[in-house]
Amino acid sequence: MLKLFISPGACALASHIALEEAGADFETRVVDLRTGQQRTPEYLAVNPAGSTPALQTDRGVITQNPAILAFVAQTHPDRNLAPIDDPHAFAAFNAFNGFLSSSLHPAIGKVLFSRPPLEAGARAEAVEQALARYQLVEDHWLQGPWVFGDGFTLADGYLAVFTRWARSAHLLDSARFHGLNAHLDRVQARPAVSRVLAAEGLSAV
């Protein structure tokens, strides 16, 4: 059985959604980031980087959301969770997930999770930079009701992690980000996503 290490509400939510959408046989283990559980010898033996998500498989541990999403899609091809049979489309899927991981996540994370919190001027600049990345998705990546057009992929669940964070912080203006807000509503309405939110003690935002 697959074992996914998560911290509720954190970015590992994307991998949790992926496994639930795939109908995978898996269990979750909570890593409490607030108490520093990610730095314990027990967890560092799973993921030496001390971060979540980490997916324990029968062949070893996979870390980083983009890698886990690709693994889940490729090991559950019947669920059509990514365009795994089209090299160009699959590259686009991976590129988008890479953007979320390397660009959008750090940008919104700086706004919300900097310790100590940013001073007013620095926070305003960080918000502007984060919103520019959301704008890029709004204007250039959303190709329909879902990121890649008419069909849901695991990239949609990943994007929803960060639109949830932005909406919760009142940064996802409904007029400026109409597409992203509508997309988030669609993702949160999916039965698999509802089950994952409930399992992590979360609710739709």
Regions found by a protein language model. Give the residues of each.
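GST-like domain detector, emphasizing the conserved glutathione-binding G-site
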Residues: 1-125
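Short, solvent-exposed turn/loop segments enriched in Gly/Ser/Thr/Pro and often Arg
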Residues: 32, 154, 200
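Glycine-rich, phosphate-binding/catalytic loops in enzymes
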Residues: 72, 176, 205
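Glycine-centered secondary-structure boundary/capping sites
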Residues: 77, 170-171, 201
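GST-like fold's C-terminal all-alpha helical module
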Residues: 100-191, 196
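Terminal-tail/helix-coil boundary detector
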Residues: 196-205
